Amino acid sequence: MSISNYKLQTKVRLQPLVLFQIIAAYERRPKTAKMAVGTLLGRRDRCNDIIEITNSYTVQHKEQQIGEMEQFKLDTQYASEMFELNQITYPQEKIIGWYSTGKSLSRSAAALHAYYSRECGDVQPLHLLVDTTLRGGHLSTRLYCGVTMGVPGGTRGLLFTLLPLLKLNTDGDESVALRLMQKQALHPTKQLGRMLPELVHVMEATRELEQKLELVMRYINDVLARKRRPDNSIGRALHDALTSVPLLDAESFRLMFNANVRNMLMSITLSTMIKTQMELSEKLSYLPDH
């Protein structure tokens, strides 16, 4: 293998969901585990040199220190079963590498690279290293690929090369949640951990949408009244935004909106019932047997 599989101009897009999954895996890891390890899933666009990391799942492993030797065992059967289950829901996602947490590369990186090289087929696996210690108040993420080094007929070695282009993709639906989290971080509420009802978020998003529509209408009216020079880029952006919205009459839109609201309320009701049932089961489990 060589580094030719990944050019320095290759754009790597990382979905924010993956970072949250890695952080959750680190927080939920067993007490005996020093780090969290898992599989990275995503898509490759070979024509445009774009790699998108869209999903991940944790893989169980065991770490054992015997003298100066550190043993690392990955549950490969569990990893295969998780990938098969993921393929049922997201068949377009393929294995593109693995992730681990820590300040630096672990001694098990070479063994993990060998395993994921077989899983990735004819391309090199990527390794995403996430420093969950938040040094300097920053979540550090580094992306590596393994390069085989050595002389022909001699001993071969593995060198992990840093891929400098790691772009966090915040252009999708996740941007709404990220903006809300950023708002809560900059202006925290007095009651920490308090979750607002879903309809409150819908009302805030609707209010923000109304403000943006007023801004757009003001711009259009100024252009029509020749108070402002038209901008072609803004015009194309408005055209793309309008053409992306399906043309519906008021009655069809009302029915569709009410149906979505009913589905959301039903989901809230079911999740509340499940939460109540789990709390009751937990309390009943502590009752003494008679």
UniProtKB/Swiss-Prot annotation:
Sorted UniProt keywords: Cytoplasm, Initiation factor, Protein biosynthesis
Signal peptide: none
InterPro entries: eIF3f (IPR027531), EIF3F/CSN6-like_C (IPR024969), JAMM/MPN+_dom (IPR000555), MPN (IPR037518)
Compartments where located: Cytoplasm
Database matches in Pfam families: JAB, MitMem_reg
Transmembrane segments: none
MPN domain location: 12-150
UniProt-recorded Gene Ontology molecular function terms: metallopeptidase activity; translation initiation factor activity; translation initiation factor binding
CDD domains, per database record: MPN_eIF3f
Location, primary (coarse class): cytoplasm
Domain of life of the source: Eukaryota
SMART domains, alphabetized: JAB_MPN (SM00232)
Cellular component GO terms, alphabetical: eukaryotic 43S preinitiation complex; eukaryotic 48S preinitiation complex; eukaryotic translation initiation factor 3 complex, eIF3m
A single GO BP: formation of cytoplasmic translation initiation complex
Alphabetized PANTHER family for the sequence: EUKARYOTIC TRANSLATION INITIATION FACTOR 3 SUBUNIT F (PTHR10540:SF6), EUKARYOTIC TRANSLATION INITIATION FACTOR 3 SUBUNIT F-RELATED (PTHR10540)
Function description: Component of the eukaryotic translation initiation factor 3 (eIF-3) complex, which is involved in protein synthesis of a specialized repertoire of mRNAs and, together with other initiation factors, stimulates binding of mRNA and methionyl-tRNAi to the 40S ribosome. The eIF-3 complex specifically targets and initiates translation of a subset of mRNAs involved in cell proliferation.
Subunit details: Component of the eukaryotic translation initiation factor 3 (eIF-3) complex. The eIF-3 complex interacts with pix.
Family: Belongs to the eIF-3 subunit F family.
Name the record gives this protein: Eukaryotic translation initiation factor 3 subunit F-2
Classification of source organism: Eukaryota, Metazoa, Ecdysozoa, Arthropoda, Hexapoda
